[in-house]
From Swiss-Prot:
InterPro entries, A to Z: AA_transpt_TM (IPR013057)
Glycosylation: residue positions: N193
Species whose genome carries this gene: Mus musculus
Stretches for region Disordered: 81-100
Stretches that traverse the bilayer: 11-31, 37-57, 147-167, 205-225, 234-254, 266-286, 307-327, 355-375, 398-418, 422-442, 471-491
Pfam families: Aa_trans
The protein, known as: Transmembrane protein 104
Cytoplasmic-side positions: 1-10, 58-146, 226-233, 287-306, 376-397, 443-470
Topology within the bilayer: Multi-pass membrane protein
Residues in the Extracellular compartment per record: 32-36, 168-204, 255-265, 328-354, 419-421, 492-496
Length: 496
C-alpha cells in the first residue's frame, strides 16, 4: 500500500486477470474455513458465506468506481496543466484575444460539459494504477486518511500474526507427531495440550516457540530491506496451492464415497457464528489490492461481469472445500489448519503426500511474509511522512522495520489459535477495509465527480449498485457486524 500512483505494469487479458484475482482471494483463510463451518453448522455457514461473498462483490464494484473517478480527476488535472502552459505561451494576445480568454476562464468555473460530450467515456478509463492510499488522500479529509492507514496497518499486523503462527504450528504438529509414538503423522483424534511432551523434556509449546524463533531469525531480516515477489515464485506458490487444494478435495470425496465419512455437522450453532463471520470476511479480502489487479487488464468492457463470475467460482470452491471437509471429518477432529487433517496414515497412505500437505502452509506463507512486512513498513512511513521531509537513517532503517516486525511476533508468541486470529482480523480490520472504506470512497468520489464534471456525467465503470441505499446498507452491515462481534467477545469473556 504505497499510497501513491505506481506503474501499471505489463497488460494482460481479462481472463488472466480473473485468474490473478482468484489466486489473491483464495489464500490462508480457506484453510481455516472448514473448522469454522463445522462449529457454526452447515446451513448457517452456507447462508453467511453467500451473503458475505455478495457484500464483498458490492464493495469491489464500489472500489472499481472510485478507481475510475480517481483516474478521471488525474486526467482532468493533466488537461488543466496543459491549458495553463498554452495560456502562458499566448501571453501576447490582442485585446480581442484577452476578451476571449476572459470568457474561457469564466467557462472553466462551470462543469466541463464540452468535455463530457466529447470524451466522458475515455475520461473515466482506468489506465493509471492509483493505490488505495492515494484515493484516500484524494477523496478523504486528513482525519479520514489517518483512519484509513490505521485500518490498513491493523489488518496487516493481523495478517503477519496469522502467518507467524501458522508456520510454527504446522512444523510443530508434523514433527512432534513424527518424533512421538505415532510416527505415522498427526493424530487428529488425540487432544493435545501445549504442555504435552514433544521431544524429550521439551513441551509442544516450547517446540512451537523454537520454530517461531527460527522463523523470525530467517524471515525477519527481510523487513529491513526492500523485497518483492518475483513472477516465477508467484507461479510456483500458486501451483503448490492448487495441487494441495485439489488433493484435499479429492481425498475427502474418496473417503466419503467409500462410506468412511465421519462428519455429522449440525444444521446451526449460533455460538460459532462469530468466528465464522471473521473467517468469511478474511477469506474474501481483495479490495486493498484491486488497483494492482484491475488496472493492467487490457480490456475492461465487461469487467463487472467477470468479477461476478470470479466471485461465483470462489463461492463454489469454498463451498466444495468446506462441505467435503465437514462430512469427511468429525467436527471435533478438524484442525485450525485443514491441511493437518491429511497428515495421517489412515487418510493418506503415501508419506510424501502427507508431508507435502502438512508442510504446504510453511512454503507458501514463508514467501508471503516478507512481502506483507515490507508493505506494512511502507505504510508506517507514508502515515508519518510530511511534504518535503526525510527520515533519519536510524528511523528509516531501524525504527520502522522494528515496529513492523515485533508486535506480530509477540502476538504469535502468546497464542497460536489460528481460527481466533483469523476471526478477529477479519471481523475488525477486515470489516473496515472490505466494507467501510470502499463505501465512503464511492460516496465521496461521486460527490466530487458531480462537483468537478457536472451532474450529467456518467462514470463508465460505475457500480451496478449505484443507489445511495447500497452505500448506507453496506455501512449499516459493517457497523452491525462490528458491534455483534464485540458484544459476543465481551459476553464470552464475562462468562469465563
Amino acid at each position: 500500500m504505497a499510497g501513491e500512483i505506481t506503474e501499471t505494469g505489463e497488460l494482460y487479458s481479462p481472463y488472466v486477470g480473473l485468474v490473478y484475482m482468484f489466486n489473491l482471494i483464495v489464500g490462508t483463510g480457506a484453510l481455516t474455513m472448514p473448522k469454522a463451518f463445522a462449529t457454526a453448522g452447515w446451513l448457517v455457514s452456507l447462508v453467511l458465506l453467500v451473503f458475505v461473498g455478495f457484500m464483498s462483490f458490492v464493495t469491489t464494484t464500489f472500489a472499481m468506481e472510485a478507481m475510475a473517478a480517481a483516474n478521471a480527476q488525474l486526467r482532468w488535472k493533466r488537461m488543466e496543466t496543459h491549458k495553463e502552459e498554452d495560456d502562458e505561451d499566448s501571453s501576447t494576445a490582442s485585446d480581442s484575444d484577452l476578451l476571449s480568454q476572459d470568457n474561457y476562464e469564466r467557462a472553466e468555473k462551470r462543469p466541463i460539459l464540452s468535455v463530457q460530450r466529447r470524451s466522458s467515456a475515455n475520461l473515466f478509463e482506468i489506465t493509471d494504477r492509483v493505490e488505495m492510499g492515494q484515493m484516500a488522500s484524494m477523496f478523504f479529509n486528513k482525519v479520514g486518511v489517518n483512519l484509513f492507514y490505521f485500518c490498513i496497518i491493523t489488518y496487516l499486523y493481523g495478517d503477519l500474526a496469522i502467518y507467524a503462527a501458522a508456520v510454527p504450528v504446522s512444523l510443530m504438529q508434523v514433527t512432534c507427531s513424527v518424533s512421538g509414538n505415532d510416527s505415522c503423522g498427526v493424530d487428529t483424534d488425540a487432544r493435545y495440550n501445549d504442555t504435552d511432551l514433544c521431544w524429550g523434556p521439551l513441551r509442544r509449546v516450547d517446540v512451537y516457540r523454537i520454530y517461531l524463533a527460527i522463523f523470525t531469525v530467517l524471515l525477519g531480516p527481510f523487513t529491513f530491506f526492500d523485497v518483492q515477489k518475483t513472477k516465477y515464485l508467484q507461479i510456483l506458490t500458486s501451483m503448490m496451492r492448487w495441487i494441495a487444494f485439489a488433493i484435499m478435495i479429492v481425498l475427502a470425496l474418496v473417503r466419503i464415497g467409500k462410506g468412511q465419512g465421519e462428519g455429522h455437522p449440525p444444521l446451526a450453532n449460533f455460538l460459532g457464528v462469530q468466528n465464522l463471520f471473521g473467517v468469511c470476511v478474511y477469506s474474501f479480502m481483495c479490495q486493498h489490492s484491486l488497483p494492482s489487479l484491475i488496472t493492467p487488464i487490457s480490456s475492461k468492457r465487461h469487467i463487472t461481469r467477470l468479477l461476478f463470475l470470479d466471485y461465483a467460482l470462489i463461492l463454489a470452491f469454498y463451498g466444495l472445500l468446506s462441505f467435503t471437509a465437514i462430512f469427511c471429518f468429525r467436527g471435533d477432529s478438524l484442525m485450525d489448519m485443514y491441511t493437518l487433517n491429511f497428515a495421517r496414515c489412515d487418510v493418506v497412505g503415501l508419506a510424501a503426500v502427507r508431508f507435502f500437505l502438512g508442510l504446504f502452509p510453511v512454503f507458501t506463507i514463508s514467501t508471503n511474509f516478507p512481502i506483507i512486512a515490507v508493505t506494512l513498513r511502507n505504510n508506517w512511513k507514508t502515515l508519518f511522512h510530511r511534504e518535503g521531509g526525510t527520515y533519519p537513517w536510524v528511523v528509516d532503517r531501524v525504527v520502522f522495520p522494528t515496529i513492523t516486525l515485533v508486535p506480530p511476533i509477540l502476538v504469535a508468541f502468546c497464542t497460536h489459535d489460528l481460527e481466533s486470529l483469523v476471526a478477529i482480523t477479519g471481523a475488525y480490520a477486515g470489516t473496515g477495509i472490505q466494507y467501510v472504506i470502499p463505501a465512503f470512497l464511492v460516496y465521496l468520489c461521486r460527490k466530487d465527480t458531480q462537483l468537478t464534471f457536472g451532474y450529467g456525467t456518467v462514470n463508465k465503470h460505475r457500480s451496478p449498485f449505484r443507489h445511495t441505499f447500497w452505500v448506507a446498507f453496506v455501512l449499516l452491515w459493517a457497523f452491525s457486524c462490528f458491534f455483534f462481534v464485540t458484544a459476543y467477545i465481551v459476553l464470552k469473556e464475562t462468562q469465563l
